[in-house]
């Protein structure tokens, strides 16, 4: 809806992302940077056989590697490398407020991670085919509804970050 267009409904389902403007405008939540992380991911294309050799995998096997500490310049968060059939998913997740306080640019972290000698060996000869970033809620909302509005998904903070895994899709389906 744009301009002077109007849309009317008895109930609106707000699935407008982690920083839900609808939830904020309805008075359900005031957003604080400390309640969010930023995840940045690259997909690096490599032949399946190269991935199997570099990660010591048999056909149809996969691997996941998780990192903390230096990869984020000690900013709370971590990094990951996951194998896919013909690509690697490589990324960094850090708390937004800590990133702001550190005065580090987010893209610098993923560049530095890629240039680590251990990671360079894994991605050598690969081609970046996708880059994405996503705001990740780190705190659940207490108010998920009000008259005529239901907040769901990331907008509702329905994600569990255990530090090793991020769970959210199962909650969306439940």
Region spans (language model):
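FAD/FMN-dependent oxidoreductases across multiple families
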Residues: 73, 98-174
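Predominantly flavin-linked oxidoreductase catalytic cores and closely associated redox partners
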Residues: 1-124, 158
């Amino acid at each position: 809806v744009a301009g002077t267009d109007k849309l009317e409904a008895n109930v609106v389902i707000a699935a407008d992302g982690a920083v839900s403007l609808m939830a904020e405008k309805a008075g359900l939540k005031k957003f604080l940077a400390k309640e969010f992380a930023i995840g940045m991911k690259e997909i690096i294309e490599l032949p399946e056989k190269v991935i199997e050799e570099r990660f010591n995998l048999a056909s149809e096997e996969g691997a996941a590697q998780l990192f903390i500490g230096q990869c984020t310049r000690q900013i709370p968060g971590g990094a990951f490398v996951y194998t896919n059939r013909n690509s690697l998913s490589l990324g960094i997740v850090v708390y937004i407020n800590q990133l702001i306080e550190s005065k580090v640019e987010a893209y610098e972290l993923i560049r530095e991670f890629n240039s680590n000698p251990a990671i360079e060996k894994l991605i050598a000869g690969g081609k970046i085919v996708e880059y994405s970033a996503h705001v990740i809620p780190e705190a659940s909302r207490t108010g998920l509804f009000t008259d005529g509005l239901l907040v769901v998904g990331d907008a509702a903070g329905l994600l569990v970050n255990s530090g090793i895994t991020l769970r959210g899709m199962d909650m969306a389906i439940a």
